[in-house]
């Protein structure tokens, strides 16, 4: 009986694909080696412990219909579009070894005519006259008895959009001697004009089979019907929820300040797991009562635009004379928090 399993998703939904990945990882036998190939439409994927409000331009994402997806592995934020080919390798311990899966990806690239090398913790780079250029980034997750390595290959990604949605860590970039995110990455189409997602998937699949000396038919995973995976519906519901994607952010504080024609406003928020644990409002307005009431009302609310707007709207009945001010405040908060 084969120990290999090959799955290919024809969905571009990041929540669907990450839910499939999670279900397979939880339920795979310890003796199985899995390759899962997939790709996402416009998405910012963040690491398990990251703060989306800090890492991402959430307002721009909302305007451009870019999704946010929190993965279960660590690491940083990345932008996915259909120019990225995503892979996940899974195996039980003690066999799980990310150097094996890295070797398989390098062998696949080599078979296509691209000589790449592993660099640092999680990158694959190609040498160019302008220096090393990253063509793949990865992240990892391990439990007591199994592990996975997942990553992307930059095939024909719209690199100009990286900067639209990500807020690069300036300290991290300075430590690596990098001037911008865009300058250090390269698409495989620059090296292999005309290369397709299907060709890359085929190369990775063949390298996977060659390494283990076995072949297996691919299982196509489709959103047209619920995948036959135990607990998939519950896993998908969690993966697509605001509570997971935003609410799992580490505790943080946010200070908002603005001057309106009717007075200056400062709002101080302490947020834990996406919920406002403390809200303080300061103002030099001649009528501070609505702001004071807003601070009290926001305590315990989710830190999300619709909730903040609703809190302002709900105060209009109590303070009808300040209707215009409260509407202006709601619009400003929505812009500032997105």
Curated annotation (Swiss-Prot):
Keyword Nucleotide-binding: yes
Biochemical pathway: Protein modification; protein lipoylation via exogenous pathway; protein N(6)-(lipoyl)lysine from lipoate: step 1/2; Protein modification; protein lipoylation via exogenous pathway; protein N(6)-(lipoyl)lysine from lipoate: step 2/2
One annotated GO molecular function: lipoyltransferase activity
SUPFAM superfamilies: Class II aaRS and biotin synthetases (SSF55681), SufE/NifU (SSF82649)
Annotated transmembrane regions: none
UniProt KW keywords: ATP-binding, Cytoplasm, Ligase, Nucleotide-binding
EC number annotated for this UniProt entry: 6.3.1.20
Recorded GO CC terms: cytosol
Compartments where located: Cytoplasm
Reactions performed catalytically: L-lysyl-[lipoyl-carrier protein] + (R)-lipoate + ATP = N(6)-[(R)-lipoyl]-L-lysyl-[lipoyl-carrier protein] + AMP + diphosphate + H(+)
Positions contributing to ATP binding: 71, 76-79, 134
Keyword rRNA-binding: no
EC class: ligase
One annotated GO biological process: protein modification process
BPL/LPL catalytic domain sequence ranges: 29-216
InterPro entries: aa-tRNA-synth_II/BPL/LPL, BPL_LPL_catalytic, Lipoate_ligase_A, Lipoate_protein_ligase_C, LipoylTrfase_LipoateP_Ligase
Positions bound to (R)-lipoate: 134
Other facts noted in the record for this chain: In the transfer reaction, the free carboxyl group of lipoic acid is attached via an amide linkage to the epsilon-amino group of a specific lysine residue of lipoyl domains of lipoate-dependent enzymes.
Subunit: Monomer.
Family the UniProt entry places it in: Belongs to the LplA family.
Role of this protein: Catalyzes both the ATP-dependent activation of exogenously supplied lipoate to lipoyl-AMP and the transfer of the activated lipoyl onto the lipoyl domains of lipoate-dependent enzymes.
Protein name, UniProt field: Lipoate-protein ligase A
Gene source species: Salmonella paratyphi B (strain ATCC BAA-1250 / SPB7)
């Amino acid at each position: 009986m084969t120990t290999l399993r090959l799955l290919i998703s024809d969905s571009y939904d990041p929540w669907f694909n990450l839910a499939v990945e999670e279900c397979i990882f939880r339920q795979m036998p310890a003796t199985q080696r899995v390759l899962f190939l997939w790709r996402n439409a416009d998405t910012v994927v963040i690491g398990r412990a990251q703060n989306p409000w800090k890492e991402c331009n959430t307002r721009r994402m909302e305007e451009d219909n870019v999704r946010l997806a929190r993965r279960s592995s660590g690491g940083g934020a990345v932008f996915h579009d259909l120019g990225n080919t995503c892979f996940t390798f899974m195996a039980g311990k003690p066999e799980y070894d990310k150097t094996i899966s890295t070797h398989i990806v390098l062998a696949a690239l080599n078979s296509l005519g691209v000589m790449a090398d592993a660099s640092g913790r999680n990158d694959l780079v190609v040498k160019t006259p302008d220096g090393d250029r990253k063509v793949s980034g990865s992240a990892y997750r391990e439990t007591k008895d199994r592990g996975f390595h997942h990553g992307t290959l930059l095939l024909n990604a719209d690199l100009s959009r990286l900067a639209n949605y990500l807020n690069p860590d300036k300290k991290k970039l300075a430590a690596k001697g990098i001037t911008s995110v865009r300058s250090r990455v390269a698409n495989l189409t620059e090296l292999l004009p005309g290369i397709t997602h299907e060709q890359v998937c085929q190369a990775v699949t063949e390298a996977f089979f060659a390494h283990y000396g076995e072949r297996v038919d691919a299982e196509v995973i489709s959103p047209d019907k619920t995948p036959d995976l135990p607990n998939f519906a519950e896993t998908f519901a969690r993966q697509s929820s605001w509570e997971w994607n935003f609410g799992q952010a580490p505790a943080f504080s946010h200070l908002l300040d603005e001057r309106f024609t009717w007075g200056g406003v400062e709002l101080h928020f302490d947020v834990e797991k996406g919920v406002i644990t403390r809200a303080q409002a300061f103002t030099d307005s001649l009528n501070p009562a609505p702001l004071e009431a807003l601070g009290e009302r926001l305590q315990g609310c989710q830190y999300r635009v619709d909730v903040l707007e609703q809190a302002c709207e709900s105060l209009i009945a109590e303070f009808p004379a300040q209707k215009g001010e409260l509407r202006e405040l709601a619009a400003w908060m929505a812009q500032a928090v997105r």
